[in-house]
């Protein structure tokens, strides 16, 4: 069974948690800038994402790679093993070819990684029957151009009714759009034990700690547009609020890889959806005094039971 989330490869591992291997792990930005020379698959039983990353690093060493980037992980069969896919890079890796953004009706189409870095000045919304995505883009860009936009990013596209009509909303930007103040979604929580230790250490370690109140690149701007049209959630980490008011937050894989768990849990049950699974994890995490958790594995047992394992953090 696939893991809950596609792996967003971790930033450089904390020296507190892992030993250093010869092959280093690249950040998503670094990996996107160069060409890999090979892609490998590593399988094994790993109790945490950090163990999987170290196994990939050892494989990269054997292949003569200077660095690597974990592309994906998944459960391998029903054995509880992981299947980890990674790209390998030479020290003198060629630079990746830069791709230019499409221009439609004179308006530049932005990918998400570029759109989240700048502030839109307005939104446009169109609704109708569109037979293809090019027709959608044509309608959106005409509306954007009418408002004097230089570029656009489609933030919401849904079926409006049972008749095949769609409703599409896009952020629109000026050429000299103001840059947003943002941080990575993979930073260490500032009020966690790992966060306090990193801040005390200072230097590069402190740079991996979140800045409270600063938006992340995982979410677009909330400065313009109507919330239901532009925001899929309130932003920030997924948080479970228990009946007694206790809040427990879920960490993504990249953040968890930079922290050291103080405990772990494993349980099985029949759960209808991931919201229920998250609640069950958070409930058990809170009983052990955890403020954060990271689901490491999920796999289907016989029948409809799901087994879940998670690391816990203070």
Curated annotation (Swiss-Prot):
Signal peptide: 1-19
Keywords: Signal
InterPro entries, per database record: BhsA/McbA_stress_biofilm_assoc (IPR051096), Dodecin-like (IPR025543), YdgH (IPR025539), YdgH-like_sf (IPR036275), YdgH/BhsA/McbA-like_dom (IPR010854)
Keyword Translocase tagged: no
Pfam families (UniProt xref): YdgH_BhsA-like
Sections of the chain in a coiled coil: none
Sequence intervals crossing the membrane: none
SUPFAM superfamilies referenced in this protein's UniProt entry, alphabetically: YdgH-like
GO BP, one annotated term: response to stress
Family statement: To E.coli YjfY.
Protein name in UniProt: Protein YdgH
Species of provenance: Escherichia coli (strain K12)
Gene: ydgH
